[in-house]
A protein has these predicted regions:
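Mid/C-terminal beta-alpha module of Rossmann-like enzyme folds, strongest
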Residues: 194-257, 271-314
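Residues forming the Rossmann-fold NAD(P)(H) cofactor-binding site
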Residues: 14-15, 89, 128
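Substrate-positioning beta->alpha
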Residues: 155-156, 174-196, 202-206, 217
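Conserved beta-loop-beta element that borders a ligand/cofactor-binding pocket
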Residues: 111, 131-155, 159-162
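SDR active-site strand-loop-helix element
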Residues: 7, 31, 73-74, 107-113, ...
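Conserved catalytic-site region of short-chain dehydrogenase/reductase
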Residues: 113-125, 149-154
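N-terminal Rossmann NAD(P)H-binding glycine-rich loop of SDR-like oxidoreductase domains
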Residues: 2-26
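NAD(P)H-binding glycine-rich loop region in Rossmannoid oxidoreductase-like domains
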Residues: 36-102, 113-117
């Protein structure tokens, strides 16, 4: 039985990966800084959760020695240049050092579509630097570059559906940016395939769905499927920049940042120059085949509540 160490396993993709690994009879260890945040994983068969920091090279080394491969999922979407560098570059430098010390050669890493040293955003450039660290390490590395990821617990379509419950119109920055959304289950399946198939070593795969949408179309679909459709108004660049700045100043994680806007200067779609999910034997699922089943439940609840109110039962 193969043993897999997962860094960043408590997040959106990590949860689905752990489920897939359990289905495939892998023994999985998830390293997290807060064990309490992984309660949803502790119920899965053959998944162990241990507390620790992925930045602690000394503690990471013996863990790596006990496993057959490590999956690197740790990432942030918002932050400063220094924060992106720490998470997407320095962490991987430490991981490579720990792998060398442990005799661990196999790394499967999730990067991002659009990762490039000359990309318009700090996020994408830091992702490219992280890839370079891994491919220059001499280790057996496979890299997955997903477009925006959707699924039942996503913070993307669910967020836009929720906003349309509250606001009468949705002013939208970056409305014409194009994406090729990919289902989280397909991403998890691709990672398992990379773990299992050594022919993926040294390769980068673009994980994209079968359809291309503008951001405006995606927001409109979120409203439509959730039963809360509102007018979506694209903002000109100057107003979009102001909106993103204000969102950064709000408490909590911003819905959109100025760096996100910079990333959207380039389309987030498959380049056609790298292998995709099909090369891993995966037929990507269409957004329309998945999203109505989780956002549609919101629309059903909204409709029932409206009927109860009309009938005087609310």
């Amino acid at each position: 039985m193969k043993k897999i160490l997962v860094l960043g396993g408590t997040g959106f993709v990590g949860r689905h990966l752990c489920e897939k690994l359990a289905e495939g009879a892998y023994r999985t260890t998830v390293l997290t800084r807060r064990r309490a945040s992984a309660s949803h994983l502790q119920m899965l068969p053959m998944v162990d959760v241990i507390e620790g920091s992925p930045y602690d090279t000394a503690a990471l080394t013996p863990l790596l020695a006990e496993h057959d491969a490590v999956v690197s999922l740790v990432a942030i979407l918002h932050g400063t240049e220094a924060a992106f560098d720490k998470t997407h570059v320095q962490l991987l430098l430490g991981l490579v050092k720990a792998c060398d010390a442990a005799g661990q050669r196999r790394i499967v890493h999730v990067s991002a579509l659009g990762a490039d040293l000359s990309a318009p955003s700090m996020y994408q450039r830091s992702k490219a630097r992280g890839e370079a660290v891994l491919f220059n390490s001499g280790l057996d590395v496979s890299v997955l570059r997903p477009s925006v990821i959707f699924g039942a617990e996503d913070k993307f379509l669910n967020t836009f559906a929720s906003l349309q419950k509250i606001f009468p119109i949705i002013p939208l920055a970056g409305s014409t940016a194009r994406f090729q959304p990919v289902w989280v289950e397909d991403v998890a399946a691709a990672l398992v395939k990379c773990i299992a198939d050594n022919s993926t070593v040294g390769k980068t795969f673009e994980a994209c769905g079968p359809e291309i949408f503008t951001l405006k179309q995606l927001v409109q679909l979120a409203g439509q499927y959730s039963g809360n459709s509102k007018p979506v108004i694209g903002l000109p660049d100057a107003l979009a920049r102001i909106q993103a700045t204000l969102m950064e100043l709000a408490p909590g994680e911003p819905i959109m940042s100025r760096d996100n806007l910079d990333a959207m200067k380039a389309d987030n779609i498959a380049s056609g120059q790298l292998p995709g999910l099909q090369a891993l034997g995966i037929t990507p699922s269409a957004l329309s085949a998945v999203v109505p089943f989780y956002l549609g439940a919101q629309g059903l609840r909204s409709g029932l509540m409206a009927k109860r109110k009309t009938a005087g039962r609310f």
